[in-house]
Amino acid sequence: MNRTARVALALALVVALAGSRAAAAPELEALNGRAIAGGKPMADVVIWLDAPSAPRPRERRFVVHQRNMQFEPRVLVAPVGSTVELPNNDRVFHNVFSFKDGKRFDLGLYPVGTSKFVTFDQPGLSRIFCNIHPTMAAYVMAVDSSLVGVSDADGKLEIAGARPGRYEYHAWRPGAEIISGSLTVSAGREIEVAWP
């Protein structure tokens, strides 16, 4: 796979209306983009922007299922402080753990129909595996930003709440390290993100 990912970012603008008066100044509703590698769409690319003026993300609860000997979803982005439930929906035991970087944990062996919970209290990437089934892998990226997007199977992503301006960005995809840089958000701008 080409180690350069091109992320085309285009702004979606909305106009706020004040009653029957003329439209107010346009405000950015979302930053829409596409992740591409080797001319093909790339899924599971995570991009987040540092914006001190943006509201802090709220802690939430998420679920990463163990189903058909896979984790679903494979990539999850969660605000720091969020709790992830890891239910065993398979017909076999699993032993979910993360030993490197991010949140370190070992949930031990647990049977079908039960769940374990992990709170991701620090920012960073946690690689999650099953001690019994080595082909099972998932990733939880805990971030301190509310401006985050994850590309879908078509490479499309949306960062809700982004406004025009200059940002520090961070980007990651499975199999690569986190890269960082700065970008200016403006209509029709294309950004090239290259992993070393």
Listing of model-derived features with the role each one plays in the protein:
Residues M1, A16, V193-W195:
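Extended interaction regions within the primary functional domain
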Residues M1-L9:
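Bacterial N-terminal signal peptides that target proteins for export
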Residues A8-A18:
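Bacterial N-terminal signal peptides
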Residues A23-P196:
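Extracytoplasmic copper-binding redox domains, predominantly the cupredoxin/blue-copper superfamily
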